Amino acid sequence: MRPSLVIFDCDGVLVDSEPITNRLLREDLAARGLDLTLERIEEIFVGGTMATVFENARALGADLPDGWVDWFYEQMYAELAKGTPLIEGIEDVLDQLDAAGIPYAVGSNGSLRKMSITLGSHPALHARLKDALYSAHALGVAKPDPELYLKPARDAGIAPEACAVVDDSATGCTAGVRAGMRTMGFAEHNDGARLKAVGAEPFHRMADLPGLLGL
């Protein structure tokens, strides 16, 4: 069944920003006494907010000063501004949604500033999405709270059960499932088991998404 609205996560779904952020985070935490592999960084932190990263890293022994979150944001923004690649195939997905007359939105735990930087590396894509960006920072709620996906649906006047979510983290997929939406778990670099465990339907190539959505 075709959805009436598709809501995408941003990092790791539209733009391949997570490797950049994870590398910066690993380097900084190692310098502050918490040496983790990139795999552990992804397992522990991906899909959350920087505030929860701060809390969890401190609990694990990182010597993080007050004000670290704001400081790290500035480091991250500067690095992302050098250029953030798109997820392969995402533009074709949006083209097919446009051809089918199906609207789409973005729901992210990241800030609007971050999305403007990462998506802004691709002006044509940013122009397609800029009026449908929903940020946890602006809404005051973050995934796994389903509100980050329910709000775009309400604004579009579309029932949750007629929507599809595309997310790459267990946290985000949990939000989609809790929202009562069909949730597609994008597992580009793993088997998708963690996404399936929270109720998502894993898939591994963005090129496969149109077929899964019945386009």
Where are these regions (language model features)?
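Asp-based, Mg2+/Mn2+-dependent phosphohydrolase catalytic module
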Residues: 1-4, 91, 95, 111-215
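N-terminal helical cap/lid subdomain that shapes the substrate entry/recognition surface
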Residues: 2-10, 14-100, 116
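Residue-level marker of regulatory loop/turn positions in helix-turn-helix DNA-binding domains and
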Residues: 86, 107, 141
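Conserved G/P- and acidic residue-centered "switch" motifs that form tight phosphate/ATP-binding loops
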Residues: 9, 13, 108, 168
